[in-house]
C-alpha cells in the first residue's frame, strides 16, 4: 500500500560527528552485507537480525521532523565556520542482490574511503532518518533523553539510529575474503531488538528518485557525555536535511564531518544526493554474504578531556 500521497516524504542523512575528546561507544547497527531473503541467518552469538558473522562496530541512524516541502536558503542556515565540500554521491548498492529495495528496507553502498583524512577511529557516524520536508522543524537533541527513537518517526517526523566508527569504512577491496557484497541495509531490525536506537523498517515503499533541489544545512560540532551504557553525541547545531520530490517518499544520504578541537571545530559539509538505483554491474553475479553489525558492548571509558565542551556532562541524561 505505501504511504498516502499527502504523507510527508522521507529523507535519509548520515552525519559524521568528528570529535576527538571521547571515544564512541560500541552500539547497535548493521553495516555489512545483505543476503538474499531466503538465506538470511543469524550470526553465531550475535544479536537478533544479524546476517552472517558479526563483530562490535559503532553505528547509528537518526531522523528529522515533518512539514511541507519548501526550498530552504543555504545562506540562512550557514554560520561563521569553515566548510569543506567533499564530492560524494550516496546510492542504492549496484550489486545484483535480491531484495535490495523492498517495501520497508533498502541497501546502500558503503561509503568506503569517503571519510579518510576527515575522521579518526574515535569519531562516530550517524545515519539520520527524517521526512525530507523537516528541515525547519528539526531540533538537535541537547540531552540523552531528547534523542528520538524510531517510533517517533510518524509523530515527530524523525529518529536517530545506527552509530558507526569510521574504521568500519576502510579503503581496499570490500569483497576480499568475505564472498559477499558489502552494503548498509536500512530498516532491517523488524523486531527492534537492537535498542535503544533500533534500525526499524521504514513505514512504506519507495520509490527512491533523484531531485536536483537539495537543501544543505550545517551540522555544528557535537558535545559528548558518558553514561554507564554508551557515549552519546549531543548535537549543538542543526544537521543537514535534504528536500526531494517523489511519488511517495524519498531516501537521501547526507554525510557531514564535524571536527572537534580546543575552542571551536571546523565543519565539513559533504555533498548529498538523492538515492538512485544504478545499472547493475555485469561482471558481478548474484551474491549472498556474511553481514557485519554493531553489537552493544561495555561502555568505553572517557579519554583525557582536551576540549572544554566535554567537561561536566557525565551526569546529564544518564539512563537508569
Curated annotation (Swiss-Prot):
Its main location: membrane. InterPro entries: Uroplakin-3. It is found in: Cell membrane. Residues 30-240 are lumenal. Residues 1-29 form the signal peptide. Keywords: Cell membrane, Glycoprotein, Membrane, Signal, Transmembrane, Transmembrane helix. It comes from the Eukaryota. One of its GO terms (biological process) is negative regulation of gene expression. The keyword Signal applies. It is a single-pass type I membrane protein. Glycans are attached at residue 133. Residues 267-320 are cytoplasmic. The keyword rRNA-binding does not apply. Disulfide bonds: none annotated. The chain crosses the membrane at residues 241-266. GO terms for cellular component: membrane; plasma membrane. Residues 273-303 are annotated as: Disordered. Belongs to the uroplakin-3 family. Heterodimer with uroplakin-1B (UPK1B). Component of the asymmetric unit membrane (AUM); a highly specialized biomembrane elaborated by terminally differentiated urothelial cells. May play an important role in AUM-cytoskeleton interaction in terminally differentiated urothelial cells. It also contributes to the formation of urothelial glycocalyx which may play an important role in preventing bacterial adherence. This is Uroplakin-3b. It comes from Homo sapiens (Human).
Amino acid at each position: 500500500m505505501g504511504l498516502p500521497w499527502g504523507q510527508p516524504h522521507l529523507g535519509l542523512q548520515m552525519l559524521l560527528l568528528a570529535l576527538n575528546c571521547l571515544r564512541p561507544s560500541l552500539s547497535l547497527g548493521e553495516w555489512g552485507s545483505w543476503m538474499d531473503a531466503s538465506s538470511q541467518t543469524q550470526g553465531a552469538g550475535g544479536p537478533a537480525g544479524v546476517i552472517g558473522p558479526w563483530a562490535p562496530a559503532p553505528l547509528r541512524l537518526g531522523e528529522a521532523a515533518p512539514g511541507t516541502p519548501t526550498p530552504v536558503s543555504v545562506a540562512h542556515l550557514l554560520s561563521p565556520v569553515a566548510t569543506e565540500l567533499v564530492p560524494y554521491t550516496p546510492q542504492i548498492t549496484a550489486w545484483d542482490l535480491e531484495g535490495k529495495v523492498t517495501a520497508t528496507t533498502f541497501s546502500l553502498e558503503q561509503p568506503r574511503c569517503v571519510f579518510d583524512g576527515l575522521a579518526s577511529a574515535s569519531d562516530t557516524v550517524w545515519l539520520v532518518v527524517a521526512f525530507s520536508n523537516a528541515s525547519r522543524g528539526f531540533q538537535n537533541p541537547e540531552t540523552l533523553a531528547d534523542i528520538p527513537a524510531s517510533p517517533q518517526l510518524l509523530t515527530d517526523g524523525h529518529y536517530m539510529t545506527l552509530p558507526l566508527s569510521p574504521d568500519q569504512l576502510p579503503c581496499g577491496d570490500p569483497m576480499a575474503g568475505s564472498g559477499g557484497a558489502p552494503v548498509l541495509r536500512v530498516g532491517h531490525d523488524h523486531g527492534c531488538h537492537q535498542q535503544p536506537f533500533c534500525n526499524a523498517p521504514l513505514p512504506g515503499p519507495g520509490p527512491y528518485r533523484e531531485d536536483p533541489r537539495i537543501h544543505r544545512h550545517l551540522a555544528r560540532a557535537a558535545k559528548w557525555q558518558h553514561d554507564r551504557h554508551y557515549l552519546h553525541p549531543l548535537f549543538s547545531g542543526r544537521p543537514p536535511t535534504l528536500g526531494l520530490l517523489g511519488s511517495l517518499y524519498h531516501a537521501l544520504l547526507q554525510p557531514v564531518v564535524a571536527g572537534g578541537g580546543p575552542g571551536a571545530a571546523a565543519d565539513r559539509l559533504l555533498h548529498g544526493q538523492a538515492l538512485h538505483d544504478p545499472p547493475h554491474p555485469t561482471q558481478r553475479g548474484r551474491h549472498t554474504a556474511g553481514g557485519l553489525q554493531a553489537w552493544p558492548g561495555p561502555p568505553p571509558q572517557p579519554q583525557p578531556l582536551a576540549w572544554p565542551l566535554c567537561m561536566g556532562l557525565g551526569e546529564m541524561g544518564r539512563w537508569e
